[in-house]
Amino acid sequence: MLSLLPTAVQAQDKPLYTVVDGYKVDADTMTGFRTWRAAACDRCHGANQEGMVGPSLISSLKAMSKDEFVKTVRDGRLDKGMQSFGTSKQVMDNIDSLYAYLKGRSDGAITRSKVEPIR
């Protein structure tokens, strides 16, 4: 069954992410997943973004704005053990894609943490 779910929309009316069958995603969202993996965010937030030492991003992104997300990733929360990624070129160059991937997980549109490109 093919189901296309562009659920979150940015201000320009361009979908924040596009998901098919719960795990096939557009190229930008795929870049976000690859950035997640490269930055090893799963060490603290868990392989399924459900939290470990760090909080669940599935829950956090339900209430956190994109601006708050960017600030947290860029500056870290050193008092809580969250490192800063502000000097990571890969993370900062792909922050919008990373947000799209994690927001899709939080919204429930992306139903598993490991995604594949839409073909």
Task: Set out the residue ranges of the language-model regions.
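Bacterial N-terminal signal peptides
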Residues: 1-4
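N-terminal signal peptide c-region/cleavage motif recognized by signal peptidases
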Residues: 6-8
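Flexible coil segments in periplasmic/lumen-exposed cytochrome c-class electron-transfer proteins
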Residues: 12-30, 38-39, 80-119
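Gly/Gly-Pro-rich "capping" loops immediately C-terminal to redox-active cysteine motifs
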Residues: 23, 27-34, 46-87
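Short cysteine clusters
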Residues: 41-44
